[in-house]
Curated annotation (Swiss-Prot):
UniProt KW Transmembrane helix keyword: no
Localisation: Cytoplasm
Protein name: Co-chaperonin GroES
Taxonomy of the source species: Bacteria, Pseudomonadati, Thermodesulfobacteriota, Desulfuromonadia, Desulfuromonadales
Family, as annotated: Belongs to the GroES chaperonin family.
Gene that produces this protein: groES
Major location category of this protein: cytoplasm
Length: 95
């Protein structure tokens, strides 16, 4: 990936959800919602505070994260789709 996010921004690759339910029903594309979790692919240096100090990021590359349905912006890099969002948009890290 040839992009480095600035400040407190994070690039996330969405994790696609299952297309079949536990009961074996196939979910059509028209009924699917965008997944709200993904893998962190790149992180910025951190948030710059008013006094000029940089608050380091709690999130690191490789973390599996949860985020809101409308968080961030969709971008396309090298033909792949990603979300770019601020660290504040991340709701939690799955461990």
């Amino acid at each position: 990936m040839n992009i480095r996010p600035l400040r407190d921004r994070i690039i996330v690759e969405r994790i696609e959800e299952e297309t079949t339910t536990a009961g074996g029903l196939i979910i059509p594309d028209s009924a699917k919602e965008k997944p709200q979790q993904g893998i962190v692919k790149a992180v910025g240096k951190g948030k710059v505070l008013e006094d000029g100090t940089v608050l380091p990021m709690d999130i690191k590359v490789g973390d599996r994260v949860l985020f809101g349905k409308y968080a961030g912006s969709e971008i396309k890099i090298d033909g792949l789709e990603y979300q770019i969002m601020r660290e504040d948009d991340i709701l939690g890290v799955l461990e």
